[in-house]
């Protein structure tokens, strides 16, 4: 079967936003207007629409399902324009900082993005975080200023904030008409027409009329700015415009705006209200006009599996004739199908029944069921092509971030790095009979989310959940209850401390055991040195002349590794150090791998104490947004939490305070902040780095864990 949709008609894009900007409403409206069974012009009464939404939720295919495929034809004047139908793959990205890891992996598979802003709040902290991530992946994007019906909505202030906060050049291509409860529609600056939504059909139909006299001057001014940005993309257009005042025609203008968006020269901006059903169709038109198809994206460069240097010299692009390659970017549990692996196909064709290679893990996988997720149903498919985003059921060894490829032409496309958890809680089922169910549920949640880990405490036997923040773990406990029907009790959150060393030492340890018959003997001499923060651990053997035979060196490494998981101070993992084995002694009869393992372990334990072992704690980057009158109290409170305030700046009519604060002092901060600011201040925090714990606190922690 040949490809049904040419690649130039594909748009793989994500919707990204701060937590309350109205992203979900936006996504739902997009699905509603593009819904296959509810095309524009045949939307039934509200009840049917809501039924469709409910059924969508019942089936678990709301827009939250990683990727949704839907279709859109450019529309003008309430009618379909004479452009072909485009295929939209919408990838959802969460809005909360505890889930920046989710955003990171979505951005790895997007071609473009729509950033949704709240017209009142503008560019918020999480918007900036996501924007920076999108910059890193060089994702072309446009902005939809949502909630123009809200009190205090200010479109032009949002345009200014985009430029101030992100450094991008914002170019409005559609300006809202009215604001708050007088929002009527928008002016399309490209065609210079008003789009007005009237009537009670949930925004499905609208009219285009000439711009009213009272708005002409403003429209001309902003159109001029838009054209200036557009003609910079083409020397001839620039010359015609500057010398003769000749404005480009509509088609040329759109292609110049597209060129500027794709080259990240500027960001097109539109406004509207998804909730009031105004402005969503022009947004969809703009996605088609300005965001990239898979053909507009540069080649994806990968490396050969097993190449330790990771030299990226293997190219893959959206071409059906190339060898198959794809990236698994999200795992979801579906009540009807089991585990679904959402995969972006970068090159080639994938058929049902194919055997493929998971090149990240070096494991073979067989393709069983393949599905296309539509807004209101899932479609079983036999084959998929470059540019598609599909769900694969029944993959055994594949997790988030793995590359899938043709075994004959292997490539690793992406190495996603997942941060270590910074917070942990003990969890147990309320009824003993649920223990098995809880273990299975946690294992499935951990398979979906690489930043979440589950471990068993060897001493207490407790199950420990580890994650990126309190909210992250709260939501996972809630999912245990909702999806796996397990009620759980959770302990107080604990900080994930680490241990390291202060300076280099040389240490020798001799292990001797004689108790009749053959004994045990091993001697090791090691140099233990600190490394730069974040460098991790490395081992090298500098043995010459066979003072420790080769076959015993794995025993030495094993002994060192056993100490890494449980440091000498309080039993926390040890990070950022290196060990060199420089000398040793052995006995022809009494030496063994086990004897050298014990010698290395004891040498490490004694050597680390000599090397000034110290405790490290996670430091969080905290941003508080507060009305000015509460600033003094909030700064004082952060300082009392051992925080270091690094700056403050005006943010709209509020103040933004930046600080670095130890995680240990941030538990339950939300409640303190609410009471200090009468509920008006808000904060976000994310992991920054590890720092040494002050001596007096370190002693308390050691006593607690001794």
Swiss-Prot record:
GO CC terms in record: cytoplasm
Matches recorded under NCBIfam families: EF-G (TIGR00484), PRK12740.1-5 (NF009381), small_GTP (TIGR00231)
Gene for this chain: fusA
Residues annotated to bind GTP: 17-24, 92-96, 146-149
Residue intervals of the tr-type G domain: 8-295
Signal peptide extent: none
Protein name: Elongation factor G
Pfam families with a match to the protein in the record: EF-G_D2, EFG_C, EFG_III, EFG_IV, GTP_EFTU
Family to which this protein belongs: Belongs to the TRAFAC class translation factor GTPase superfamily. Classic translation factor GTPase family. EF-G/EF-2 subfamily.
GO molecular function annotations of the record: GTP binding; GTPase activity; translation elongation factor activity
Domain of life: Bacteria
Keywords attached to this entry: Cytoplasm, Elongation factor, GTP-binding, Nucleotide-binding, Protein biosynthesis
């Amino acid at each position: 079967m040949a490809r049904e949709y040419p690649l130039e008609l594909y748009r793989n894009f994500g919707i990204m936003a701060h937590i309350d900007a109205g992203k979900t409403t936006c996504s739902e409206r997009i699905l509603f207007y593009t819904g296959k069974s509810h095309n524009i012009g045949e939307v039934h009464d509200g009840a049917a629409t809501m039924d469709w939404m409910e059924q969508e939720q019942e089936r678990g295919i709301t827009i939250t399902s990683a990727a949704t495929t839907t279709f859109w034809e450019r529309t003008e004047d309430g009618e379909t324009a004479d452009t072909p139908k485009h295929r939209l793959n919408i990838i959802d990205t969460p809005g909360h900082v505890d889930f920046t890891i989710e955003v990171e992996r979505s951005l790895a598979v997007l071609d473009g993005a729509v950033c949704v802003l709240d017209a009142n709040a503008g560019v918020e902290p999480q918007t900036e975080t996501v924007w920076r991530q999108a910059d890193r992946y060089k994702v072309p994007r446009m902005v939809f200023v949502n909630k123009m019906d809200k009190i205090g909505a200010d479109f032009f202030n949002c345009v200014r904030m985009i430029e101030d906060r992100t450094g991008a050049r914002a170019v409005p291509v559609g300006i809202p008409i009215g604001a708050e409860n007088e929002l009527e529609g928008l002016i399309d600056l490209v065609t210079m027409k008003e789009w007005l939504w009237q009537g009670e059909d949930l925004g499905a139909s609208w009219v285009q009329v000439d711009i009213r006299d009272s708005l002409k001057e403003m429209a001309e001014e902003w159109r001029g700015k838009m054209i200036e940005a557009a003609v910079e993309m083409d020397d001839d257009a620039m010359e015609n415009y500057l010398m003769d005042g000749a404005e480009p025609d509509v088609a040329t203008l759109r292609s110049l705006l597209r060129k500027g968006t794709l080259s990240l020269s500027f960001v097109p901006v539109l406004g509207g209200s998804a909730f009031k059903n105004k402005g969503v169709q022009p947004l969809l038109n703009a996605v088609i006009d300005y965001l990239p198809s898979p053909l507009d994206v540069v080649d994806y460069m990968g490396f050969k599996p097993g190449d330790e240097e990771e030299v990226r010299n293997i190219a893959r692009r959206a071409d059906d004739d190339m060898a198959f390659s794809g990236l698994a970017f999200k795992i979801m549990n579906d009540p009807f199908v089991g585990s679904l692996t959402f995969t972006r196909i970068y090159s080639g064709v994938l058929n049902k029944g194919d055997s493929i290679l998971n090149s990240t893990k070096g494991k073979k996988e067989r393709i069983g069921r393949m599905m296309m997720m539509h807004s209101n149903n899932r479609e079983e498919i036999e084959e998929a092509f470059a540019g598609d985003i599909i769900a694969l059921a029944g993959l055994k060894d594949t997790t988030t971030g793995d590359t899938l490829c043709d075994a004959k032409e292997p490539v690793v496309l992406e190495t996603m790095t997942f941060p270590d958890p910074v917070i942990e809680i003990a969890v147990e089922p309320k009824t003993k009979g649920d223990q098995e169910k809880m273990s299975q549920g946690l294992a499935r949640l951990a398979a979906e989310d690489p930043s979440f880990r589950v471990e068993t405490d060897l001493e207490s036997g407790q199950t420990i959940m580890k994650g990126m923040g309190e909210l992250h773990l709260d939501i996972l406990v809630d999912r245990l209850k909702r999806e796996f029907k397990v009620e759980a009790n959770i302990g107080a959150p604990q900080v994930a401390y680490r241990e390291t060393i202060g300076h280099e030492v040389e240490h020798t340890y001799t292990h001797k055991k004689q108790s009749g018959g053959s004994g045990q003997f091993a001697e090791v001499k090691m140099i233990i040195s600190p490394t730069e923060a974040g460098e991790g651990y490395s081992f090298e053997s500098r043995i010459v002349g066979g003072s420790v035979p080769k076959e015993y060196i794995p025993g030495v490494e094993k002994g060192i590794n056993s100490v890494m998981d449980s440091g000498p101070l309080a039993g926390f993992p040890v990070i950022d150090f290196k060990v060199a084995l420089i000398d040793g002694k052995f006995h022809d009869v009494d030496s063994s791998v086990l004897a050298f393992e014990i010698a290395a372990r004891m040498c490490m334990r004694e050597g680390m104490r000599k090397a000034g072992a110290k405790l490290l704690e996670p430091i969080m980057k905290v941003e508080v947004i507060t009305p000015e009158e509460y600033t003094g109290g909030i700064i004082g409170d952060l300082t009392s939490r051992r925080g270091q305030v690094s700056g403050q700046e005006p943010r709209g009519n509020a103040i933004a305070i930046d600080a670095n604060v130890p995680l240990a002092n941030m538990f339950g901060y939300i409640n303190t902040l609410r009471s200090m600011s009468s509920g008006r201040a808000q904060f976000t925090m994310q992991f920054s780095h590890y720092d040494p714990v002050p001596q007096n606190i370190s002693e308390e922690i050691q006593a607690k864990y001794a």
